[in-house]
């Protein structure tokens, strides 16, 4: 009896120490789901896969004309989602969604996407599956809720000009690639940073932010007129590609794909500069993201900067809140462990 009590206590302690904040891969397959309505809660970083054996050529119940048109054009999840009754592009509604892929095998349609590590506001949307059940085509609903993780926009550059400003999660967003070629951000240690490119561009260098561009001549003076010129051109001859470990003396964990990339800056005390770009598929256009870590000189000396009033230079308040939560969790975890051990101790007497 005593031995089983000790084993039970160890299992509980293990769960307390390991079950917090785990990223999950979640699957919803309507071939095996019995109910017609499936709620699914996600958090930043989760990966979800959805499968539906579509039957669209039969008599379909509960489908209005608008839905029928979208489904005839195969505008399925997760490329497209329903927010209320409105068909919406996932990458616009959940900014920074990445690895959005789908495949078809016969009538089975399977799609997957990764929730970005930064979600500014709660997101709610539906996926509709029309499938045959008992010789009748019925409508089944996957209702997804994504919990938010931060309270303020993060330092970053989003060059998707056609997306709604209301769904933006970065300090610079909805910038037209035709008019704006450069975006400068000034994060601090601990901040998330992000670069998001249009669908006909891709992020360079490969593996950004693990690999970055740095100036070949870092002490070269930047001309005053260039500093505020948002149309200044990218000149690859002035940069080298290096590992971020070379720049920061430590690695950074990145998440994303060739269109959207995220990273959380480590604890860096020094002033550090680096660059990543969005390059058009024909390699004729480049959109620059310049990152200036722990650099406040531009703010104090150059308040004339275009867009500086829009730019929120740090989301440190967010991390102060998160750190307090983590400290609180750590304390409660140790308290729980202490109580369990005391319980086991007195149980043995």
Swiss-Prot record:
Residues 316-349 form a propeptide. Disulfide bonds join 77-127, 157-183, 197-278, 208-276. It is found in: Cell surface; Cell membrane. InterPro entries: 6_CYS_dom (IPR010884), 6_CYS_dom_sf (IPR038160), Parasite_Repro/Invasion_Surf (IPR051444). It is a lipid-anchor; GPI-anchor. A lipid is attached at residue 315 (GPI-anchor amidated asparagine). It comes from the Eukaryota. The keyword Nucleotidyltransferase does not apply. One of its GO terms (cellular component) is side of membrane. Residues 22-149, 153-301 form the 6-Cys domain. Keywords: Cell membrane, Disulfide bond, Glycoprotein, GPI-anchor, Lipoprotein, Malaria, Membrane, Repeat, Signal. SMART domains: s48_45 (SM00970). Residues 1-21 form the signal peptide. Gene3D superfamilies: 2.60.40.2860. Glycans are attached at residues 294-295, 301. This is Merozoite surface protein P38. It comes from Plasmodium falciparum (isolate 3D7). The lineage of its organism: Eukaryota, Sar, Alveolata, Apicomplexa, Aconoidasida.
